[in-house]
Amino acid sequence: MEKVSFSKISVGDEIPELVKKVTLIDLLQYAAATWNFFLTHIDKEFAQKQGFQQVNIPAAYFGACLTKLVSDWIKDPGQIKKLGYRVIRMSFVDDTLKFKGKVSKKYQEAGQNLVDCELWVENQDGVQVATATATVSVLG
């Protein structure tokens, strides 16, 4: 995939989606990388004792995947200037999550080419489980 350039971006352009079937191994690796070993994110029996149907996906995992979605799209030397997200529904191990986005605004400010993006995450049933926004800078 070629690098994104400001001149070729249009409002409404879709960001290539990132699809992840989240496995227990993914969550264990994420726990190790972030030192977040809260048991509802890695132990099914503990999660069920806490009232969850299954091991649940930590909210910060969404942030990591949304960052990957955007950075894979803009590539180096593009930069993520701002990213904010909100998880609105629980997601669980073995869910398939689709990280999606589109360009909502394109502008120049302080000598930078900036692009605002609307982002969201859907589960395997097409239900939105997270929303997000990002601002990125890209070359001409």
Residue ranges and their predicted role:
Residues T40-F46, I80-K82, A110-G111, N123-Q128:
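Glycine-rich loops and low-complexity Gly/Arg-rich segments
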